């Protein structure tokens, strides 16, 4: 009998064990972050279960309401938002919540407050629920100096001030990708155990990739640098092979593929939407944080994405993120345009 093999299967690094290990490296830690993360993990498990049962439980379809973005809300959108608001509030470790689904920030009542602000998109890509495409939850976490007097200014910070970010993808498996500021790790939900197990330790994005990811349906409205970059991807003049286009209307799915395989994800501004469509706080910042922690880059067309200082909780920004060298290429095109302007 292969006892060594059995031992390998039983020595599982769960996400809770991983975070506790990280906590032990910081003597000043009191366990607040671990408790907060456990509530986020619980929310992800609940939403994963709801997504898997959506068709049977009649959660597919519209809820008959629109969110602050003017988008029709799916039933799962509404449910997912309620799940995360309740999970984060009951943790006793948050003071402000910003959700894609809510017009205003949620200020936690004083008796339940903690030192963290959480920004999140409870169900990114929900447009694809009905057809079974991978969708996900995106989140970012800030820490405040004084939670008793916390204001909106404590949330409107540059992304570089985040203490953690991640996403949970609900697809063929349920995968949670997390960074606490010291690299990126991926955990997969084992349904038989009900635990997220470390399956992708220390994720590093390749320096250059063979894939680009963009909605080419908007090409006629793109600016010069984006148009030139995509042309270069399809028709390289340096003798290299063309890049392959891979795109689906789910940021989590696109970014997850880019993170693992390399390449670049582009959501530029255009003539119709000069500021792009992705929200800074709970889409651009968390994904940019993860990309940088994995060795990649994130750029807005003007500056490093994580240096942006938002002025509104639902502010939008263009973003180009992915492999370091691929993002360098599009940065060079924007720099060249600046020189000729």
UniProtKB/Swiss-Prot annotation:
Question: Binding of Mg(2+) 2: at which residues?
Answer: 100, 121, 123
- Entry keyword Metal-binding: yes
- Which reaction is the catalytic activity of this chain? beta-D-fructose 1,6-bisphosphate + H2O = beta-D-fructose 6-phosphate + phosphate
Q: What class of enzyme is it?
A: hydrolase
Q: Principal localization?
A: cytoplasm
The subcellular localization recorded is: Cytoplasm
Gene Ontology cellular component annotations, sorted alphabetically: cytosol
Binding residue positions for substrate: 124-127, 215, 247, 267, 277
The cofactor required is: Mg(2+)
The record's EC number reads 3.1.3.11
Question: HAMAP family, from UniProt?
Answer: FBPase_class1
Family to which this protein belongs: Belongs to the FBPase class 1 family.
**What is noted besides the main data?**
In plants there are two FBPase isozymes: one in the cytosol and the other in the chloroplast.
* Record's protein name: Fructose-1,6-bisphosphatase, cytosolic
């Amino acid at each position: 009998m292969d006892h060594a093999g059995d031992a390998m299967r039983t020595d599982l690094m769960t996400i809770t064990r991983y975070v506790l290990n990280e906590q032990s490296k910081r003597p000043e830690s009191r366990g607040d972050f671990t408790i907060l993360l456990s509530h986020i993990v619980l929310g992800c498990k609940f939403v994963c279960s709801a997504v898997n049962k959506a068709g049977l439980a009649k959660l597919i379809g519209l809820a008959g309401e629109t969110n602050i973005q003017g988008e029709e809300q799916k039933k799962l959108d509404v449910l997912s938002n309620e799940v995360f608001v309740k999970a984060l509030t009951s943790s006793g470790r948050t003071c402000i919540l910003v959700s894609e689904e809510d017009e205003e920030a949620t200020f936690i009542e004083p008796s339940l407050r903690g030192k963290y602000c959480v920004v999140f998109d409870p169900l990114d890509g929900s447009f694809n629920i009905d057809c079974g495409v991978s969708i996900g939850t995106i989140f970012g976490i800030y820490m405040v100096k004084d939670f008793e007097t916390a204001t909106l200014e404590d949330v409107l910070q540059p992304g570089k001030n985040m203490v953690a970010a991640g996403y949970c993808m609900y697809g063929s498996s349920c995968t949670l990708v997390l960074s606490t500021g010291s690299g990126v790790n991926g955990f997969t939900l084992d349904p038989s155990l009900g635990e997220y197990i470390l399956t992708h330790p220390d994720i590093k994005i390749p320096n250059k990739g063979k894939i680009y990811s963009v909605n080419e349906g908007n090409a006629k409205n793109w600016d010069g640098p984006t148009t030139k970059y995509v042309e270069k991807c399809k028709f390289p003049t340096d003798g290299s092979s063309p890049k392959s286009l891979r795109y689906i209307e789910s940021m989590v799915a696109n970014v997850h593929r880019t993170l693992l395989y390399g390449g670049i994800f582009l959501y530029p501004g255009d003539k119709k939407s000069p500021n792009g469509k992705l929200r800074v706080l709970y889409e651009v910042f968390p994904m940019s944080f993860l990309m940088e922690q994995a060795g990649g880059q994130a750029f807005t067309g003007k500056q490093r994405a994580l240096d942006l200082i938002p002025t509104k909780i639902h502010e939008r920004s263009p973003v180009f993120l992915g492999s370091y060298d691929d993002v360098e290429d599009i940065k060079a095109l924007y720099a060249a345009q600046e020189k000729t302007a």
